[in-house]
UniProtKB/Swiss-Prot annotation:
GO terms for biological process: queuosine biosynthetic process; tRNA wobble guanine modification. The gene is queA. It is an enzyme of class 2 (transferase). This is S-adenosylmethionine:tRNA ribosyltransferase-isomerase. GO terms for cellular component: cytoplasm. HAMAP family: QueA (MF_00113).
Length: 347
């Protein structure tokens, strides 16, 4: 592919950006997108109609943490957004007013007894820090003093609300560690899951802790863009279910780009998947050959974003530009709290 960003750019009216989810969640629009056919609008609760008995649906079971923290170092105010936990137990974070931070600096969080020590100032607003507590004590600390790191396009002048605490969590949430919600999962309700079960569609989960980098557009060139690493895991049970589904001719249906990116990171050339644990920074763009995923359910993404490039790689750039033009013309709602599309993979 070329390094031209123009095919991945489009004008999105501001009033198309959803600031609240659909209620109920499964009443949001689901746009069925198939290469070579016009976009076909439905609603989320229709999802089972487009899947087949024996298909395997895979969702991300990460749970969002309260990743935004207000810290001080002496008189200086430092804003932190936790990005991902590192192998040594410290945290990578994006920091505002971080220029003067240096190793061994101690950060305080109001009157809370928990502190953090700066391990490294990486520059460009990135730091690694170690907290004075871990495990359940750390989780309790985040609940006391942290706030949800809502995407910047969900405007909350007074910060995230109690309603956001409920709205920005998926029905699959199990393992804490994500900065951002895997938003395709936000649409699922117990009723939708029951309908999938009734049709004989299997379900498994994986874990990818979504980092703050998911919000970043490509600002320079495609070739120069560097993806942020995110930690994920596919356990042996899920890997076996994928391989069994593939062997008997079923399709792998990824709920969200996070699930797809981890599946493709773990996939072998023949489309089978091994148990996997570690960090991935996979950047999927047109020209990529998909190995693991056949169908993708995902929300509508930002212009010039790596996620829009991913869906263009999956279903074809012209197909996705047509689908997004349809969505804009028909008032569909974009981004985290918005509507979704069900994408069939281009041949």
């Amino acid at each position: 592919m070329t390094d031209d960003l123009a095919p991945f750019d489009f004008e999105l009216p501001r009033d198309h950006i959803a600031t609240e989810p659909a209620r109920p969640r499964d009443s949001a629009t689901l746009l069925h997108v198939r290469p070579g056919l016009p976009p076909d609008p439905h609603v989320i609760r229709d999802l089972p109609d487009f899947l087949r008995e024996g298909d395997l649906l895979i969702a991300n079971n990460t749970a969002v943490i309260r990743a935004q923290l207000a810290a001080t170092r002496g008189e200086a105010k430092i804003g932190l957004t936790l990005d991902r936990i590192l192998a040594n137990g410290s945290w990578h974070a994006l920091a505002r007013n971080s220029r003067k931070l240096k190793p061994q600096d101690i950060l305080h969080f109001g009157d809370d007894p928990v502190t953090a020590t700066v391990i490294e100032n990486e520059g460009d607003g990135a730091v690694s820090i170690r907290f004075s507590v871990e495990g359940d004590e750390f989780d309790a600390f985040l609940e006391r003093v942290g706030a949800l790191a809502l995407p910047p396009y969900i405007e909350r002048p007074f910060g995230p609300t109690k309603q956001d605490d409920a709205d920005y969590r998926t029905i699959f949430s199990q393992y804490r560690g994500a900065v951002a919600a895997p938003t395709a999962g936000l649409h699922f309700t117990p009723e939708v899951l029951a309908a999938l079960d009734a049709k004989g569609i299997q379900r498994r989960t994986l874990t990818l802790h979504v980092g703050a980098g998911t919000f970043l557009p490509v600002r320079s060139t495609i070739a120069e863009h560097k993806m942020h690493a995110e930690w994920g895991e596919i356990d042996a049970e899920t890997a076996a279910a994928i391989n069994e589904t593939r062997a008997r001719g079923g399709r792998i249906v990824a709920v969200g780009t996070t699930s797809l990116r981890l599946l493709e990171s773990a996939a072998r050339e023949d489309g089978t998947v091994a148990p996997w644990r570690g960090e991935t920074s996979i950047f999927i763009k047109p020209g990529y050959r998909f190995k693991a995923v056949d169908v993708l359910m995902t929300n509508f993404h930002l212009p010039r974003s790596t996620l829009f490039m991913l869906v263009c790689a999956f279903s074809g750039t012209e197909t996705m530009r047509e689908a997004y033009a349809y969505a804009i013309a028909n008032g569909l709602r974009f981004y985290s709290y918005g509507d979704a599309c069900l994408l069939e993979r281009a041949p």
